[in-house]
Amino acid sequence: MPFSHTKIVGPAGRYGARYGMGIRRKITAIEVKQRGKHRCPSCRSLVRLQRIAFGIWKCPKCGFTFAGGAWTPQTIMGKALAPEELKEVEAQKARWRETAR
């Protein structure tokens, strides 16, 4: 097995001894969250979403493109507002069911 310089520092190992440990720890924390698996807002599948541009994300499974955070698909503020949006969607579905009858 080849020797790995990134066993402890993770993705920040590509910087070697440069930039200081504090910055490299922050980079590691951001990149681990960014490249991890996230839930698609459309198909609800748990996949590695593709970051197309700064804040633009795409689901590889269903092809859904959406705006999210710069480094993560969903921001902290977006998570806080999500329950309210779900209530509105459920209310709309209920209204549609009533009109369909």
From Swiss-Prot:
A zinc finger (C4-type) spans 40-62. Keywords: Metal-binding, Ribonucleoprotein, Ribosomal protein, RNA-binding, Zinc, Zinc-finger. One of its GO terms (molecular function) is structural constituent of ribosome. GO terms for biological process: translation. It comes from the Archaea. Its cofactor is Zn(2+). The keyword RNA-binding applies. The keyword Zinc-finger applies. GO terms for cellular component: ribonucleoprotein complex; ribosome. Binds 1 zinc ion per subunit. SUPFAM superfamilies: Zn-binding ribosomal proteins. Belongs to the eukaryotic ribosomal protein eL43 family. This is Large ribosomal subunit protein eL43. It comes from Pyrobaculum neutrophilum (strain DSM 2338 / JCM 9278 / NBRC 100436 / V24Sta) (Thermoproteus neutrophilus).
